[in-house]
């Protein structure tokens, strides 16, 4: 239910899928009244913002978002329980990579044909999908679409936070350090989740604030990391 409430607040309007996909049956059985109430809220949001959006595009990108996240959530659950390098977590990666390659074809074709569309046109979830699929691609593809994302941020069509995450991903791959502290990994010795090295770490929260990201201590808690800012 929390995920549905989050999607509603982000103007998720794939109402048809929410009401017909059997994957949501477990929530209906758990609390039919609460599910119906949330669906009505989502329907209302859809009716209010639909005239502003391209529903074909938003529904298309929403479906890609679900495919991108479904296996990753299963992987994250296994990683939290057994560790990132465990067989229980690693078994998901072949299928994740396959999904990523298919989603990348779809999203790059979309961007090449229609540009980096704003949340006003494709919804918050659709807009996030464009970033997530590029973020989950290879470095060459990330480099190729980085200028397009930078331009989209300047035009208020994309989130500065998304740009920060992509820049960090590229920086870690190239240099082994990051700028905004968004990238984490499992320490091979302690098996704990830690941040990749952060360049000029004393000023990381100032840089994060400029990109509209929460303080690193708050972000770290999402991964079970206790972070104390450097004085």
Where are these regions (language model features)?
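Short acidic alpha-helix initiation/capping motifs at coil-to-helix transition points
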Residues: 18, 140-142, 196-201
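Short secondary-structure transition/capping segments
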Residues: 29, 228-231
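Extended, non-catalytic structural segments that build the interaction scaffolds
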Residues: 89-92, 189-196
